[in-house]
A protein has these predicted regions:
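N-terminal Rossmann-like or analogous alpha/beta NTP/dinucleotide-binding catalytic cores
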Residues: 1-117, 199-211, 215-220, 271-275
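Active-site cores that bind ATP or allylic diphosphates and position pyrophosphate for catalysis
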Residues: 105-240, 247-252, 273
């Protein structure tokens, strides 16, 4: 059976951009006859708060989205579904990549990587050196095929879309596995077949498809993707938790209903099919 997923991060209260992504995901699931798995990406323990996890369940129920797999509340999530219970699996994947020579230890900041000033791979720093992250090398000649839910397939070069991503954080951040690795491992292991994302995550999709190739995760390489336009405010700025976008919690508590968000999600999806998609909220 086809399966898609909703995978929020509990680093703040959800906003309209999250809601529209969830609603588009639910509509895609309905159209292709897929189940929906709820996965809460909770590896970032420093920013996670219990009220943010509770907000995910409250928001999905307020939006009228039913899911067929995953936790029903915070306690069940912590007991049975937390990504922290999969650390051994992520370490197994890191070991495979390390043995294949796909990883290198890096002490550079994100800014240093973006300036292409990093020479850590050439210097072959030890993986157990202090204050290093483990990065995935993206070869300049690597190309991946992105299978779409709507439209034509794309061929993308991961290295042209992003610098080498961190797959394991520095020790000061708990040496924990990073988003790109956990996301592709979870999607592959959980049988996800359809993924809906904002277009700002196209680079992540390319990176994860290459990562799946290196890990032999063939199921992920067959996943179909839909990358929707970003949901912006009236000024054209992307909605985000860090910028204080109006929360769904605030909407619920003020007595608002999600009808306008549902209509906007359907308009956006119809626009994508017709090639005219735009999305902003007042």
């Amino acid at each position: 059976m086809p399966l898609t997923r909703i995978a929020p991060t509990p680093s703040g209260y959800l906003h309209a951009g999250n809601a529209i992504n969830f609603l588009i995901t639910a509509e895609v699931a309905r159209a292709v006859g897929a189940g929906i798995r709820l996965r809460i990406d909770d590896l970032d323990a420093e920013r996670m708060r219990p009220p943010y996890v509770d907000d995910i369940f409250a928001s999905l129920r307020w939006l009228g989205i039913a899911w067929s797999e995953g936790p029903r509340d915070r306690m069940e999530h912590e007991r049975m579904y937390s990504q922290l219970s999969r650390l051994a699996r992520y370490e197994e994947c890191l070991h495979v990549l390390k043995e294949q020579g796909d990883l290198y230890a890096c002490s550079c900041s994100r800014a240093g990587q973006k300036r292409s000033a990093c020479d850590c791979r050439k210097r072959e720093r030890p993986f157990n050196a202090p204050n290093v992250a483990w990065r995935l090398h993206l070869p300049s000649d690597a190309v991946v095929r992105v299978e779409p839910i709507h439209g034509e397939a794309q061929w993308l070069s991961p290295s042209r879309l992003m610098s080498d991503p961190v797959l394991r954080q520095r020790a000061e951040h708990g040496a924990r596995p990073a988003y790109q690795l956990a996301s592709v491992c979870d999607d592959a292991d959980q049988g996800v077949t359809h993924i809906v994302r904002g277009e700002d995550l196209l680079a992540s999709t390319a990176c994860q498809l290459y990562l799946a190739e290196r890990l032999g995760l063939e199921a992920f390489r067959r996943v179909r993707f839909l990358h929707h336009p970003l949901v912006t405010d009236a000024t054209g700025a992307k909605l985000s938790k860090s910028e204080g976008a109006a929360s769904l919690k605030g909407m619920r508590e003020s007595g608002q209903w999600p009808d306008a968000l549902r209509e906007q999600a359907l308009r956006l999806l119809d626009g994508m099919r017709a090639g005219t998609a735009q999305s902003s909220v007042p």
